[in-house]
């Protein structure tokens, strides 16, 4: 991350930095049984235990200390994981709810600001045969910890067809002279922090609001191999016309999600 000239702050760095992902995995399944199997498969692939491991690794990468972990698998499908984090290591006495109801103020300062969470949403539609899996991830920190340090790791771990990313810096912090600072590092695009291999894999477009410190990037996987999008279907068993139909169906679905609107054809 490119930092601005080093500042001497008055007190704690109160800037809140939030990195939000919305990732999509798309496939085609031509029977009800196949669609149900896909939902079960993807639900297991992204179960709460695996997601917890990914988020704990994320904490390690950004240098955050774990305060508390909550994870849950839902019926019939879906999972959630939430991890509360802080900048400095905490002794158990400071975060123990049974410690005469005395909780360190530094812990309270982080409970509403510094967290990492993920929620999953598998779904399908019987008429089209399209199945989608969506996961929402948010890494929100305050202090010197930057969620952008985990950007490449999370993209690689989730291996998605479509990704929308938003990075926001909120609030302000003061230096020792009382001057407010609304951001503490240079950025003009989330793409600045992506590795070259990720940039080569995706087509990307930015929608940024610089004056509000809001940065938005949409990503669409460049390589389209129909075989990778068929669930319980052998590509060799499909007629040319059927292959063409499925490719158009998948392409339309992916473009609609990428652009965030319905496309008539």
Curated annotation (Swiss-Prot):
GO terms for molecular function: adenosylmethionine decarboxylase activity. The active site is at 114 (schiff-base intermediate with substrate), 119 (proton acceptor), 142 (proton donor). Pathway: Amine and polyamine biosynthesis; S-adenosylmethioninamine biosynthesis; S-adenosylmethioninamine from S-adenosyl-L-methionine: step 1/1. It catalyses: S-adenosyl-L-methionine + H(+) = S-adenosyl 3-(methylsulfanyl)propylamine + CO2. The modification Pyruvic acid (Ser) is found at residue 114. One of its GO terms (cellular component) is cytosol. Gene3D superfamilies: S-adenosylmethionine decarboxylase. It comes from the Bacteria. GO terms for biological process: spermidine biosynthetic process. Keywords: Autocatalytic cleavage, Decarboxylase, Lyase, Polyamine biosynthesis, Pyruvate, S-adenosyl-L-methionine, Schiff base, Spermidine biosynthesis, Zymogen. It is an enzyme of class 4 (lyase). Binds 1 pyruvoyl group covalently per subunit. Its EC number is 4.1.1.50. Its cofactor is pyruvate. Is synthesized initially as an inactive proenzyme. Formation of the active enzyme involves a self-maturation process in which the active site pyruvoyl group is generated from an internal serine residue via an autocatalytic post-translational modification. Two non-identical subunits are generated from the proenzyme in this reaction, and the pyruvate is formed at the N-terminus of the alpha chain, which is derived from the carboxyl end of the proenzyme. The record marks 113-114 as: Cleavage (non-hydrolytic). Belongs to the prokaryotic AdoMetDC family. Type 2 subfamily. Heterooctamer of four alpha and four beta chains arranged as a tetramer of alpha/beta heterodimers. Catalyzes the decarboxylation of S-adenosylmethionine to S-adenosylmethioninamine (dcAdoMet), the propylamine donor required for the synthesis of the polyamines spermine and spermidine from the diamine putrescine. This is S-adenosylmethionine decarboxylase proenzyme. It comes from Buchnera aphidicola subsp. Acyrthosiphon pisum (strain Tuc7). The gene is speD.
